[in-house]
């Protein structure tokens, strides 16, 4: 009987010793189980007991592996997702971070849960990403993707900025605020939630627009269909340089008068979970949301 996964990638970056030990234990255990295992080359100097030919770049891992195991917190998963979503590869996480909303597996007993996953006992869901383009004088000046959110904000100095929002080229609203969070369902439990945005079920094909400290009494978050294209036109009268932040990890400079185009990526992240995964249990467990009264 053919295994669901033959080639497995272990992904992470140098962190604390506990995380490094988890990488090492994963490699040894998977190799013993007969899998072909490759490791993120950012760990090559730390894990010097692993043969050098077993290290590859993130792009090469995406091409070669059937399954990627991301060790770390949600930040590691977000960084890996922007690249791995380009390839036909399933992804699961071992939590070595703080919240671990996207990384399901407990590092203390990952073998038990992974054994079932490697037998094919798992559930899979596709999480879409957002593509963000900065247009200046009719040309694309910069571009990146985000699994959680794309955020227009003033940059290093907090002050209000002015911009207009268009949905499928139809004017929606204008705003003076500290910025705007454009979030996927995956990101709805992250920065968007802190900004007062709605929690979107992870399977929804929807995008939320959450104003940041709007200078009005009537502004509210807006949820639109996931296939809609969002265009933000930054006022030419804004002071200084603004930015668009992708997942809080990539910054794209924005000048007054620029257009920001945000739309659903054609790529998806194939995220897998153990069979007993329950989204609402994660909400309660990680966010302390709506515990049962009786």
Curated annotation (Swiss-Prot):
SUPFAM superfamilies: NAD kinase/diacylglycerol kinase-like (SSF111331). Its EC number is 2.7.1.23. GO terms for biological process: NAD metabolic process; NADP biosynthetic process. Belongs to the NAD kinase family. The active site is at residue 74. The keyword Kinase applies. NAD(+) binds at residues 74-75, 148-149, 159, 176, 178, 189-194, 249. It catalyses: NAD(+) + ATP = ADP + NADP(+) + H(+). The keyword Aminoacyl-tRNA synthetase does not apply. It comes from the Bacteria. GO terms for cellular component: cytoplasm. One of its GO terms (molecular function) is ATP binding. It is found in: Cytoplasm. Keywords: ATP-binding, Cytoplasm, Kinase, NAD, NADP, Nucleotide-binding, Transferase. NCBIfam families: PRK01231.1, PRK03378.1. This is NAD kinase. Involved in the regulation of the intracellular balance of NAD and NADP, and is a key enzyme in the biosynthesis of NADP. Catalyzes specifically the phosphorylation on 2'-hydroxyl of the adenosine moiety of NAD to yield NADP. It is an enzyme of class 2 (transferase). InterPro entries: ATP-NAD_kinase_N, ATP-NAD_kinase_PpnK-typ_C, NAD/diacylglycerol_kinase_sf, NADK. Its cofactor is a divalent metal cation. Its main location: cytoplasm.
